């Protein structure tokens, strides 16, 4: 579903979920891919769609604008070494190529701490004027990972999203691109709500998009 995707911006931040769940659309697929070698993991259809989505977004950024790509699981970091907290000017295609090449080196793993991604967004100077969030469901942890793996109930995951949202920089639209995960029925409505509250947009694309 597409509700007026808000493109444009002079400081565009793309946040990419790189947790283990981005390997599959069902828990069974995630478990199967997690047992595979890394070179197979990065060819998982859902992760390839994620990479294609980021590449498509970069084609919408105007020359001269600034951008940044952060990948996040239990931590958040830029895909261009040494550029954390700063912006990259879109002078020519090589700027995007470097950021995308860094993203392609990432192998999805670990849990999802959305609060880390939103804290990174708030720490950027100057702050973003447009954020794109690519994820597949509600976060599985808050600011710190649990000492031992544990099942996380839906209400706790919703609370992790509320905690993360409180860290967002003020008055910045969040455009959510959701690649839904089986067994997380609340994700769509809660991320739609986040997008609407921030005057962003929400998209749950078909598997062959973009």
List PLM regions with ranges.
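Extracytoplasmic/secreted envelope proteins and their assembly/folding machinery
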Residues: 9, 47, 51-58, 96-103, ...
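Structural recognition of the beta-strand scaffold that forms the well-ordered cores
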Residues: 13-15, 68-71, 132-133, 173-178, ...
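Solvent-exposed loop/turn segments at secondary-structure junctions
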Residues: 18-22, 73-78, 108-111, 127, ...
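VWA/integrin I-like adhesion module and closely mimicked acidic/polar interface patches used
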Residues: 137-197, 203-205
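Von Willebrand factor
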Residues: 1-7, 18-22, 26-36, 51, 87-128, 132, 139, 189-192, ...
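Extracytoplasmic
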Residues: 7-13, 19, 51-52, 62-67, ...
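…and closely analogous acidic/polar surface helices at protein-protein or active-site interfaces
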Residues: 22-69, 85-95, 107
């Amino acid at each position: 579903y597409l509700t007026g995707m808000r493109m444009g911006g002079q400081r565009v931040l793309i946040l990419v979920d790189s947790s283990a769940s981005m390997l599959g659309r069902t828990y069974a697929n995630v478990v199967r891919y997690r047992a595979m070698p890394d070179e197979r993991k990065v060819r998982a259809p859902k992760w390839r769609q994620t990479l294609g989505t980021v590449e498509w977004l970069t084609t919408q950024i105007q020359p001269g604008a600034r951008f940044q790509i952060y990948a996040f699981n239990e931590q958040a970091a830029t895909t261009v070494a040494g550029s954390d907290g700063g912006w990259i000017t879109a002078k020519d295609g090589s700027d995007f190529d470097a950021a995308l090449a860094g993203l392609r080196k990432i192998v999805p793993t670990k849990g999802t701490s959305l609060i880390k991604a939103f804290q990174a967004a708030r720490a950027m100077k100057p702050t973003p004027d447009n954020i794109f969030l690519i994820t597949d469901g509600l976060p599985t942890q808050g600011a710190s990972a649990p000492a031992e793996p544990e099942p996380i109930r839906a209400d706790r995951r919703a609370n992790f999203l509320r905690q993360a949202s409180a860290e967002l920089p003020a008055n910045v639209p969040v455009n959510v691109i959701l690649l839904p995960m089986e067994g997380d029925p609340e994700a769509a409505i809660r991320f739609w709500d986040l997008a609407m509250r921030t005057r962003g947009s929400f998209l749950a694309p078909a598997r062959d998009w973009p």
